[in-house]
């Protein structure tokens, strides 16, 4: 009998030991905890730093500068060394958490996001949103060993070492992709409806073949707030051979009529019994019991009222604590996992934003009053971190492809139809059917394009300041200068024959200016949508960053840049390209993908272009 008890204890100890060893870095997050449970690391996107926290003392040991917009972070195996994906600088930075120092950096092609490491600390896997790969990096030499194709715009990543697999989420489809590490090939895929979107992360169950993915659904034919953007956690059965291998759990009805918005991350406890999800739009978290029933999957336990814009959640390796990062409070909150009462709070960094910009960013991400009446949606639901959501919406004025906010300060007026000349005009959207909020201005809203709404509300002006703050990063296709093909494409683009540069001119490659009358153009696409109300002339969009912003045109019908130049260039209204041969079209595309190949703002200032900051 005593032998059986000892054997059982040994098996239990081995299981818990294995959970502890693999808890650091199993799935991507802005947070990670060292395998020995002594250190917490937090990636601070706005600050460009990583904060190292002593777990027992609840105090900051180091704040380490790493670069622009750090995202995923992972401890390396059992060590206190770290790797962080620096999204806007296109590199992984290696850190010593004990010393608070940078060790090295590894350049990558573009936009690293999620990071996981194997238990031995010898291999690092990093998703690259563009061009859609996972970089496998030797953690000793810090050299890229191979680039593994992993679907379209991958962000989330989780490692299943036992089965030699990576699981990756496609950001704009919320699909889960399985990659076999031996062959480096995609071997399976769990696809949801076409409306599923913005899947940044996934987490694996520690003992069962399940993956949990927080995401939204973008219902593009609905322009009322209560049905247009919906929050979900999808559960994938990784072993099932049945047709239905993915269940989607609605989070807006998980707790009766208590609506949440913008799911960001989830975490599962080391024993696999508890799942916590955070919602960055409503500043809430859900604690759920994980069920072993292959039916309901999750059972509600409690709501957590969180700080501004919670973006990360992680359990300690022993499962006794849960950590939540409130990105716009710049703090980490510690919860006891028995009761989920707060144990403590740590300020991870100071805000690098001005008070006005911080206020504007909080409003931009908020799905609460006064911005939103019914909690489902925020500005960030369609423009997360200033990016487009990859969707074409059936708006009241017609089909509208979501536009980037990058460079917007230099490219007013706003919208495809130039129907707004200042961000403050979005008070109409805040009060309208989409957001149904109380609004930020007292009294009636001035008509768009009429008397300015700027200067009427400090909150509304702050929203404008944040919205106009997004800046382009340089294209990875021109890191070493324009290629020979791009140089040929540039000559074609600027030629009098193609006439591309007549409208796509200047440092931002647009003739859009805030001075009236606005310059709108009929490029032959206005008759392709029977629901169009404001066409057929449209404002010229900037071409910067176009390499990663498909689909294209106001109606989003062009899937590629080649289609913009050929299939959708009717009667050569959108520049003259019908005479170009396939090689010339390819050269032109290479030039477009290289934009921007230099910083646009110095040239814009030299040309005395108008910058709208508020």
Tell what function each PLM region has.
Residues 59-64, 101-106, 143-148, 185-191, ...:
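A short beta-strand motif characteristic of beta-propeller blades
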């Amino acid at each position: 009998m005593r032998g059986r008890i000892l054997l059982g204890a040994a098996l239990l100890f081995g299981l818990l030991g294995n959970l502890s060893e693999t808890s650091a870095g199993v799935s991507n997050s802005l947070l990670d905890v060292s395998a020995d449970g002594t250190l917490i690391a937090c990636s601070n996107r706005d600050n460009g730093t990583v904060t190292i926290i002593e777990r027992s003392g609840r105090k900051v040991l180091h704040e380490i500068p790493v670069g622009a917009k750090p995202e995923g972070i992972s401890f390396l195996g059992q060590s206190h060394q770290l790797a962080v994906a620096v999204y806007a600088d296109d590199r992984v930075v290696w850190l010593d958490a004990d010393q608070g120092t940078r060790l090295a950096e590894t350049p990558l092609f573009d936009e690293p996001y999620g990071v996981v490491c194997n238990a031995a600390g010898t291999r690092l896997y990093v998703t690259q949103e563009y061009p859609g790969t996972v970089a496998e990096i030797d953690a000793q030499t810090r050299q890229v060993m191979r680039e593994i194709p992993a679907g379209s715009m991958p962000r989330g990543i989780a490692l299943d070492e036992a089965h030699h697999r990576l699981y990756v989420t496609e950001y704009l489809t919320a699909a889960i992709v399985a990659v076999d590490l031996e062959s480096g090939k995609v071997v399976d895929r769990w696809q949801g409806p076409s409306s599923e979107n913005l899947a940044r992360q996934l987490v694996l169950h520690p003992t069962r073949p399940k993956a949990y993915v927080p995401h939204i659904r973008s219902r593009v034919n609905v322009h009322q707030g209560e049905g247009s953007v919906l929050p979900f956690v999808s559960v994938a059965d990784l072993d099932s051979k049945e047709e239905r291998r993915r269940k989607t759990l609605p989070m807006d009805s998980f707790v009766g009529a208590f609506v949440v918005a913008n799911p960001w991350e989830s975490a599962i406890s080391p024993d696999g019994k508890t799942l916590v999800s955070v919602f960055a739009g409503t500043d809430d978290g859900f604690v759920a019991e994980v069920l072993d029933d292959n039916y309901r999957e999750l059972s509600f336990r409690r709501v957590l009222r969180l700080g501004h814009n919670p973006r990360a959640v992680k359990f300690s390796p022993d499962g006794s604590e849960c950590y939540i990062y409130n990105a716009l409070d710049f703090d980490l909150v510690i919860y006891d996992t028995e009761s989920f009462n707060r144990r403590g709070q740590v300020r991870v960094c100071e805000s690098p934003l001005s008070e006005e910009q911080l206020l504007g960013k909080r409003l931009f991400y908020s799905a609460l009053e006064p911005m939103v009446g019914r909690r489902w949606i925020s500005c960030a639901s369609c423009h997360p971190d200033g990016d487009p959501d990859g969707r074409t919406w059936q708006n009241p004025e017609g089909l509208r492809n979501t536009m980037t906010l990058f460079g917007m300060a230099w490219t007013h007026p706003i919208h495809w139809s130039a129907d707004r000349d200042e961000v403050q005009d979005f008070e109409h959207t805040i009060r309208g059917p989409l957001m149904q909020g109380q609004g930020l201005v007292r009294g009636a809203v001035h008509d768009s394009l009429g008397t300015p709404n700027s200067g009427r509300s400090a909150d509304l002006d702050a929203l404008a300041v944040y919205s106009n703050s997004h800046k382009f990063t340089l294209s990875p296709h021109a890191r070493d200068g324009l290629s020979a093909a791009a140089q040929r494409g540039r000559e074609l683009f600027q030629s009098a024959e193609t006439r591309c540069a007549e409208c796509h001119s200047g440092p931002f490659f647009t003739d859009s200016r805030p001075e009236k009358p606005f310059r709108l153009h009929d490029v032959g696409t206005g008759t392709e949508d029977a629901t169009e109300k404001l066409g057929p002339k449209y404002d010229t969009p900037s071409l910067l960053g176009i390499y990663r912003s498909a689909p294209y045109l106001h109606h989003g019908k062009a899937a590629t840049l080649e289609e913009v130049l050929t299939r959708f260039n009717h009667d050569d209204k959108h520049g003259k390209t019908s005479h170009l041969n396939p090689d010339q079209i390819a050269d032109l595309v290479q030039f477009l993908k290289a934009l921007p190949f230099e910083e646009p703002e110095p040239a814009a200032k030299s040309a005395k272009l108008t910058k709208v900051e508020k």
